[in-house]
């Protein structure tokens, strides 16, 4: 299900066996965002991630929305991805960072690998 929020809002995705099964939208932050950047409520996100962990759900990454037609990552997006991956335990080998692009709610899936910090564009399919 694609978010219907304004550009530069976001949240987190969780799942099992590499499949996304749940998500959380950062409701508090959407009222505080500029139209050019997304700043997540990390305290709330971390509490959701901890809750998911206790339920057997893995943290798989963070999504956010972009302005009309912008499918590429900004330098700030890439820096944020690297900082998040650097804070993960070594058991986390990859994190996903979907970007939902308005106006067609197109999803562009990016990921980052732990060992190399390589950011890549990924193929995906919806079940």
What are these regions (language model features)?
Residues 1-60, 67-127:
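Conserved beta-strand-loop surface patch within small alpha/beta domains used
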